[in-house]
Amino acid sequence: MYFFSIITDLSLTNLTKIHYLCKRIPETEGKMNIIEAKFAGSCTRASQKPSRRLPEFAFIGRSNVGKSSLINMLCGNSKLAKTSSTPGKTKLINHFIINDSWYLVDLPGYGFAKVSKEGREELRKMINDYILRSGEMVILFVLIDSRHDITKIDREFLANLGENGIPFSIIFTKGDKLGPNALKAQIERDREILSEEWEEMPPMFASSAVTGAGKEEILDYIQQYINL
């Protein structure tokens, strides 16, 4: 099954509720501080990724969700991942080695803004190949724009992950665009929408690349998996 297309073969209306299959880990002590973040390489297929095998934590979202800005905020480097006012700028799978112990993986966005039909197909295959064949991927962080209700394409994407047993967590981006109460209400609204398809919710984080909100929680969550 392909995960992402403008039209998917997974019907949300006929879908039996999905059980979240990601292994729940016990909370452990440990804080993560990113001391060093370096670009390690780009590829178009999982077989071409860096040869050094380390845990991988991948980030993906619809075009213009603020993925590059979030990655830069997490790493404390405003120039690590290239940001652009043009949606869909990331066209390769980019690996960054963090603290010489794990990879942060920047995946192309789905939604394919301003991309040709052939380009959409190539990006779809590239994303599928990485998610299905990267044996080192620990968690896929799916980024959702907190300013709006979760979209149909986001829901279909998450449902496909669930049906295929892909471990993931959700990060709500651009939290600074809403007040605290409005942000909380919007996340609860999205929880209600997702509860139509999910028996239980995956881990969720609220974030802002502008204020740094969510940085500590997301990095400490990653650290818990590295500690296993």
State the predicted function of each range.
Residues T90-I93, P108-G135, R147-A159:
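Switch II of P-loop NTPase G domains
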Residues I34-C43, L178-L228:
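Canonical P-loop GTPase G-domain recognition
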Residues G30-L107, F112:
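Conserved G1/Walker A P-loop phosphate-binding module
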Residues T44, K89, W102, G109-F112, ...:
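Conserved nucleotide-binding/hydrolysis micro-motifs of P-loop NTPases
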Residues D129-E200:
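Conserved C-terminal guanine-recognition region of P-loop GTPase G domains, centered on the G4
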Residues I6, K17-K23:
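Short, positively charged and aromatic/hydrophobic N-terminal segments
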